[in-house]
A protein has these predicted regions:
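Nucleotide/phosphate-binding catalytic cleft detector across ATP-hydrolyzing
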Residues: 1-106, 114-232, 239-293
Length: 293
């Protein structure tokens, strides 16, 4: 479906069931979940237990929407776990120890930051600035600079191939893209450079850095030494933006490093969270269980 974005006929609609980390289309989300449940449980004799990863800043209303949708799709129990916790578990971090761990998860719609210790979240923040906003920044830049309109999928490719927020000491990269000239309406080919994309992307990333600085200001002094030693764990597809680790290390003075499998860390951690169920329940308020009646 993603490859069809911007390429469909007028009678076909491509829908994002989830946007900014929350449900945007309940009916489509329910049908999607039913399809997934049928794949893992074709007989449908037993209802599954489902763990859903949600942004740290999710509201009670949004949580309830997630729960109701998953339950109506055929789940027996629904568990909600916050993204930074799932990311840490998926990256192999030991969240049960008393030392502080700081996690930055940059997904498609939201960026979540949390300091973890002893199975709990000490302090956290969530901003609606992530991979999708970076793509939008590239689209805006190309439109204002070259008077050419490119699609979201093209912007995403540009971001992955040459997007960067740190060009110091780095070789220039270029990529050729095609779009529609807004004056003539005709196709036009342009060449973009990694150097020219640094500032448009850095403007967006500043919001993440500000949120990270705010979280660090709230962190108890006892955990700061641990965090300085352990560094900052980065997960999510957006965390793979070139130079982001260098920029964060330079601005926040904490060594930032990418997880071994950043794209799948949250998904892996969400699955593994069932192994931590008893431990996470012990005073861990962000892990919630809802059962069908």
């Amino acid at each position: 479906a993603y490859t069809m974005l911007g390429k469909t006929a007028s009678d076909i609609r491509v829908v994002r069931p989830l946007e900014d980390g929350v449900i945007s289309d309940y009916e489509v989300t329910e049908q999607m979940l039913k399809h997934f449940f049928a794949k893992v449980n074709p007989s449908r004799v037993f209802k599954p237990r489902v763990c859903v990863c949600v942004p740290s800043a999710i509201t009670e209303v949004e949580s309830r929407s997630v729960i109701d949708t998953v339950m109506s799709s055929g789940a027996r129990n629904v568990y909600l776990i916050e993204e930074p916790v799932a990311a840490a578990i998926g990256a192999g971090m030991d969240i049960t120890r008393p030392g502080g761990i700081v996690v930055l998860d940059i997904g498609g719609g939201t960026s979540d930051i949390a300091v973890l210790s002893l199975n709990g979240i000490v302090c956290k923040s969530s901003v609606k600035m992530a991979g999708n906003k970076m793509n939008a920044a590239i689209v805006r830049y190309v439109r204002s600079t070259y008077n050419v309109l490119i699609g979201d999928s093209t912007a995403d490719r540009v971001k992955r191939e040459i997007g960067t927020v740190w060009t110091e000491g780095q070789p220039e990269k270029t990529v050729e893209v095609k779009g529609r000239n807004l004056v003539t309406g005709l196709p036009q080919k342009i060449t973009l450079s990694s150097y020219e994309l640094e500032m448009p992307l850095r403007v967006e990333v500043e919001r993440i850095i500000s949120a990270l600085q705010s979280v660090m200001e709230q962190t108890p002094p006892e955990l700061v030494a641990d965090i300085e030693k352990n560094g900052l764990l980065m997960t999510g597809g957006g965390a793979m933006l070139d130079g982001l680790d260098k920029l964060i290390t330079n601005r926040v003075r904490i060594r930032a490093h990418l997880a071994e499998n950043p794209v799948e860390a949250v998904a892996i951690g969400t699955g593994k969270s069932f192994e931590y169920l008893g431990k996470l329940y012990d005073g861990f308020v962000s892990y919630t269980n809802y059962s069908s009646r």
